[in-house]
């Protein structure tokens, strides 16, 4: 009788340890998914910013340059167009 109770308690303890480890693994997986979502969002923002050329970046027309920049006709790089805004 005592051995059956001991085996049952040991089984319950083992089950609790396995469930706890599974829960920790689930939390780590959730953290990785959230981290991946944040990184993907950051990459998407950077990709949108990369669609234009920055100051002194090479260009062939004004549309290649970022906001407040224009393409210099002789040197073909983006320079400030002289405008201000917020």
Swiss-Prot record:
The keyword Plastid does not apply. Disulfide bonds join 52-66, 59-71, 65-78. Expressed by the venom gland. Keywords: Disulfide bond, Ion channel impairing toxin, Knottin, Secreted, Signal, Toxin. SUPFAM superfamilies: omega toxin-like. One of its GO terms (molecular function) is ion channel inhibitor activity. GO terms for cellular component: extracellular region. PROSITE patterns: HWTX_1. Residues 22-50 form a propeptide. InterPro entries: Huwentoxin-1 (IPR011696), Huwentoxin_CS1 (IPR013140). It is found in: Secreted. Its main location: secreted. Residues 1-21 form the signal peptide. The presence of a 'disulfide through disulfide knot' structurally defines this protein as a knottin. Ion channel inhibitor. Belongs to the neurotoxin 10 (Hwtx-1) family. 17 (Hntx-9) subfamily. This is Omega-theraphotoxin-Hhn1f 4. It comes from Cyriopagopus hainanus.
